[in-house]
Each structure stands twice: as C-alpha cells, then as structure tokens.
Curated annotation (Swiss-Prot):
Family: Belongs to the UPF0212 family.
Cross-referenced InterPro entries: UPF0212
Matching NCBIfam families: PRK03922.1
Organism, as annotated: Halobacterium salinarum (strain ATCC 700922 / JCM 11081 / NRC-1)
Top-level division of the source organism's lineage: Archaea
Protein name: UPF0212 protein VNG_1264C
C-alpha cells in the first residue's frame, strides 16, 4: 500500500516585517534544508483558522520582527502496511532534515494506482 502523508511544520523566521515576507522566507528556508536529499517533498502554505470562531487566518504570525509560519509538507510513502507506519516514516524522513522544527501529521491518505499515474503524467492507453 502507498500513502500520501501531509505533515505540518512550525518554521521560525527572524527579521521580517510582513506575513508575506515570512512565508516566502520560510518556504525557501525549508526547501534548502530538504534539498537535495528530499526533493520529492512538496512544500505549501499551511491553512490556519481561529479556534473560537473558525475564520481563516494568515499562515504566519509576526511579532517583534519574528514570525512562526505554518507550512504543509507532503510526500508519498511506498510499500507500507498501515497508515501509522506511513506517518512514522514521513515524520522521520522530514524530521531528520528539519532539526528543531516541530512537526505534526495532519493526514494520511491511501494512494491508488490511478492517483499515482495522474501525478506522474503516466498514460494508461495502449497502442
């Protein structure tokens, strides 16, 4: 079984003035830490919402020129027996490269053969 695992990372960024700047720097910083070993990990802005009213908020919180940015890192883990196994592998692989950055598994989805072929651009038709 193959699984797509999405992990949330809380990336600290220093000397920033705006949330947009913080997000750009956090994505760049995370990409540098993951590459070239884990260039197959997709990096996206995290989605945050207010715990009280549920409204969407910025993925970065800026105070005193420092920021904490929520990023979502996703990767496909191949040949696992259970979802928990896929989550552990993803946390270990990503966590080794992102030292001192908190990680939390957001979701684990089973990947079907159709999903794999669509994401890799495979063609199922035969001539």
């Amino acid at each position: 079984m193959d699984c797509r695992v999405v992990v949330e990372a809380a990336v600290p960024v220093y000397d920033v003035q705006s949330t947009d700047e913080a997000v750009r720097i956090a994505i760049s910083k995370t990409g540098e830490m993951l590459n070239p070993d884990l260039n197959y990990v997709e990096i996206e802005m995290g989605s945050r919402s207010c715990p009280h009213c549920g409204t969407d908020t910025e993925p970065a919180f800026v105070a005193a020129d420092e920021s904490l940015v929520a990023l979502e890192l996703s990767m496909t883990v191949f040949n696992v027996e259970r979802d928990e196994h896929a989550a552990r592998i993803a946390r270990k692989e990503i966590g080794q490269r992102l030292a001192n950055i908190p990680l939390a598994v957001l979701e684990v989805d089973t990947v079907t053969d159709d999903d794999t072929q669509e994401s890799t651009g495979g063609d199922t038709e035969t001539a």
